[in-house]
């Protein structure tokens, strides 16, 4: 049983938010954007403790549009979760029978909807939470569904395990923490217990007998019974070792040896990164132990905040493999680009704050059209082996797409309706579907990003804007221009992506639009620019989409041609002479240009610092770069 949809209203910084959740969902974004609020909303809904003193709901959880808002009079908090069976009959039969009172049907599939609200009650003089199971129409269920045992049973089958970012190994590896709860399930055979306790008693006696001061201390303490009781004084003895197995387990701890020749040290004496990792592994062990005893049908939800805390990049990358194998549904937040590098694109949710309200962007799993799925369509899809792109939407019976598709496929789909009276209308609808799907990566795209874009993929999703350029030279130059114009790109959240080194030119505009990230692309004015433009258009973009975002240097110039046309040949000859010798100062122009283009990174590594230090020189750099950065500065994106 997994949560498929979450609806949040008037909770903390969230005014209105609807989310689709998968088996794994990773929330990323800037601080205070609402990531933890989303996790807490889900956690509170699945909590067993209700009322202001137990749920986590307080007046501070009510969304306030301004600082003068009174939580008592503002709209109430409302959190709603939907849990839909993945396919008919997929859920455990015993669980379905146990939760029958609160289940409804969506087609042939079972579905559970739970709504939690929290509003001010003048009668109770407190914020009063209310939880209700809902009908498919969103109305509260009545009758047997209102029994309190239904909520208890529901929580039993969907337990939530939360691990916050501020985890403390000292707290968790304590008898009252996860460590203690894990040890409570330890069972030692009675014969072994008796043998251990006998051995401990003998060792205890030897330790005390080793120094007569210990015996005298015990005798002195024993006098306290005479003062307290009076008539029949007792005695006291020192206990140096545990007297019961429970005591021994309670005193247990963890020692770690980092390398074979290093000493064994307590966990508390290790670094913060190792302690944080240890807590995660303890969390996994404790939950796994608990789930071993779970009934059939129970499926846990893991809510983990910033699993990468204190870890170095390689460890953060490796950690994804660990947490992604947790059995159940996984919801995580992270600020680590290294952790994000391995997260599948469709598992990412980018959280932002706009106008004081949280917004979330993601890649849709599929897009449904208004065009019906016919026998002709089915034959075309099967014959062309396009099941990975198209499918029939079971709810509407229409064509649904799972990734972008080419104009050729759109034309052939339209051909399936060429004899229909409304063939023109259906062709237009297919074109609309293609345009909507332009932001959805294919399986090949994900592989390409994983291979080419690993070095930038994690970082780019934390940026406020993407600037796409062809290569390393452009990357260095735009950073230098921005610095000279007193508007450093990194400080303003602009990531520069040299897309030729990191995948197909069409992938990044599509991803940017899917995640709501503004983008611009600047390319050379040569023949290659048309190839890049076409790669974007092939995904379903149109001319209007690219009008303000795709810019070229003057045709037919590439970057070096443009720099020379702007009058920088003398400066570039001097730079090239430092690299290749004085012949660069006097060689023919054609030879000079060939040599310059053959030493792109070499000349730019010298030119870029000069540009960064000279605002006048920066203003004379290629117009496309200067105008764009000046525009950024004026708009302050």
Where are these regions (language model features)?
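Electropositive, glycine-dotted interaction segments
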Residues: 86-195
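Short glycine-/polar-rich loops that comprise or flank the Walker A/P-loop
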Residues: 75-79, 110-114, 156-160, 299, ...
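Acidic, divalent-metal-binding catalytic cores of TOPRIM
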Residues: 354-637
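Conserved P-loop NTP-binding catalytic core
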Residues: 40-108
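Switch/communication elements of ASCE P-loop NTPase nucleotide-binding domains
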Residues: 1-47, 257-435, 439-443, 447-456, ...
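Extended helical coiled-coil dimerization/tether regions that scaffold
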Residues: 169, 174, 182-304, 395
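Conserved nucleotide-binding/hydrolysis micro-motifs of P-loop NTPases
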Residues: 44, 83-89, 120-124, 167-170, ...
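Short alpha-helical segments and helix-capping/turn motifs at coil-helix boundaries
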Residues: 61-67, 99-102, 138-150, 238-240, ...
